[in-house]
Amino acid sequence: PCASGRAAHMSGSAQHLRKLLTFFFQAHPWHGIAAEASHAGHYHTYVELTPFDGVKYEVDKATGHIRCDRPQKYSNLCPTLYGFIPRTYCGTAVGRHCAKQTGRESIHGDGDPIDICVLTEKPISNVGILVNAKPIGGLRMIDDHSADDKIIAVLEQDMAYGHINSIHELPIAMVDRLRQYFLTYKLSPDETNPPVEITHVYDAAEALQIIRYSQEDYHE
């Protein structure tokens, strides 16, 4: 067969092998799962933290297992599901966008997959699960010269939040709760200056653009 035919056959064989391996091994949540969900503009989210967790969990990058990162130091709890979008990475493109929007220099991505908060009506108390989420906006957060965006999304088909398409449709109190959590969850009671700052709240269009930048960074 011609070279193009052999290449197509090898590509098909590789896809078949990957499909077979999923029957025996769990896919790595960062690298082994597609970012996009079945509906356009919706994304898979791997949940690392719920509003019920007094312990911070995160994915071990080497193994893909969920691990205990640390107990939450203080009493504040994340008001939403919290996790990341697979096959994303906050690198050069994400950092450049943050620098452009803030007019600052020397901003770089934080070297992690893009973070995402998912609003739900029903309580979900399990970590290490996948949900489909629709981004509606985000918080531009900077942590020690690192772009650490927090995408805000709603659970797909959620009865209370699923119809929302813009962060500006949310009650302002919910946005304030998210801002307060991220500004204070690392603060001790004696500290007054947050180690992070939130410079902007942005809408769905920019959230989707930042996700695309994080996908570009992942594939570099």
Kindly give the residue locations of the regions a language model identified:
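Hydrophobic N-terminal alpha-helices or hydrophobic patches in metabolic proteins across all domains
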Residues: 1-220
